[in-house]
Structure formats: C-alpha cells, structure tokens
Design a protein with these regions (language model features):
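A hydrophobic alpha-helical transmembrane-helix feature that marks the membrane cores
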Residues: 1-244
Length: 244
C-alpha cells in the first residue's frame, strides 16, 4: 500500500493502482467506517463536555483544580505522550484494544485541560461558544459532504498555515493588544474550520484524490476531535476578548 504521508498519517492516493482494492469503492465499507469514526468522536466530545461542565459549574472542583497546578502539568504530559504515540506509532493506533485505550487516555487528559481552560471564562461565554461551535461544525460537515471542491489536496497549505499561526501565537503572547488577540483567535478558528473540512473529506474517500485508510478509524476520530476542540477554544477566545 502506497501511503502518502504528505497528506497526513494513514492517507493514500486514491488513484494509486496498488490501493484500488483497498479504497472506499465499496459503499458498505465506507458507511461502516464513517459510522465508527463518528461514534468514537461522539464519545470523545461527551467526555470533554463533561469535564467542561464539571469545572465550569462546580465551584469546589474548580477551586481545587485551580489550586493544584500539578494536575494540569500531569494532564499536559499525558496528553502529549498519548497524542505522539497515536500519531507516530501506526501499529498502536490500528490495533484494538490498545488503540481505544490510548485514545481514551488522550481524551481524558485533553478533556481535563480544556475544562481547566474553559473555566477561566464566564459561564455564559462558554455556553455561547459551545452553541456557536456546534452550529459551525455541523455546517462545515454538511459542506464537506456536499461540495464538489476537493480539500484533500490542501494538506501542504494547511501545514504552512498552522506554522504561521504558531509563530503568530508566540508573538501575540508578548503583545497585550485586544486587536492582535482577536485577529489571532479569528485566524485560528478559520484555519481549523478548513482543517475540519479537510479531515472530513479524507475520511469520506470516494471521489477525493486522497483518503484515509479504513483501518485508521481511531486516527480519523482523533483528527476530527482536535479540529472541533480547537475551533471551540478559538471561538471562546474571540468571545472572551470581544467582551474585555
């Protein structure tokens, strides 16, 4: 199988004759793959929303977590290790049940970190961000399924955009200006919105030039999850800075 890692781990060129027998030409395989990915994604989002709700609406828990910074550090280390393992170790992310275990560990750690971050904002801002993120992600998903434009060829452009965003973010840390912060958050929300369309089309396969392998269901769910939580955090940042 000729994997095209320039387009993401586990991706391949759908026009490569070596993979024609293993692509998504079988509708039942494609539908089953998509159902599995979205089922995993829903569980991840439910866990994450649980942490956000707990840390935003339970004062004692919020106070304990904010007074115990070591919990945040441990969760951050666990999240990074789990994410690197899933991204770089193909045998781990393709083999059940270890792939589910690693994804669960990652989701718990990431959910906790997001809950801590969200708890620094006002409750109504968090609720507004959840609502806007839900609407945006549903609209983008429908767009990804319906549009004739193939976003799977934008992997290189999106990678450059993320690098620019990272550099911009470092600069924004030292420039305490409301406009700069709003521009940074808006750019982040835009980039990860495009990434959501890109990752959705990779999962869909079919007529798109690049697809993610059917055995990469955990990796596909991880990609979509990261897109959604990044969109949420950037939208939350936009709301927070707009109210300052």
């Amino acid at each position: 199988m000729a994997y095209n890692y320039n387009q993401g781990y586990g991706g391949y060129d759908a026009e490569d004759p070596e993979v024609k027998g293993f692509d998504f030409s079988d509708q039942s395989i494609r539908r089953g793959f998509i159902r599995k990915v979205y089922s995993i994604l829903m569980v991840q989002l439910a866990i994450t929303m649980g942490f956000i709700a707990l840390l935003c609406y339970e004062p004692k828990t919020k106070a304990f977590v904010h007074n115990t910074p070591s919990l945040f550090i441990v969760a951050l280390v666990v999240m990074i290790v789990a994410m690197i393992t899933l991204a770089c170790c193909g045998e781990v992310r393709r083999k059940a049940p270890i792939n589910y275990v690693m994804l669960f560990i990652f989701t718990i750690a990431e959910g906790f970190l997001l809950g801590v971050s969200a708890s620094t904002y006002k409750q109504d801002a968090v609720l507004m961000a959840v609502g806007i993120t839900t609407a945006v992600c549903l609209a983008l998903t429908l767009f990804a399924f319906q549009t004739k434009y193939d976003f799977t060829m934008m992997g290189g452009v999106l990678l450059v955009a993320v690098i620019i965003l990272l550099v911009f973010g470092i600069v924004a840390m030292f420039v305490h200006n409301k406009i700069v912060q709003l521009v940074y958050a808006s750019l982040g929300a835009l980039i990860f919105s495009i990434y959501l369309v890109y990752d959705t089309q990779l999962m869909m396969g079919g007529k798109h030039k690049y697809s993610i392998s059917p055995e990469e269901y955990v990796f596909a769910a991880l990609n979509l999850y990261l897109d959604i939580v990044n969109i949420f955090m950037y939208i939350l940042a936009i709301i927070g800075h707009a109210r300052d």
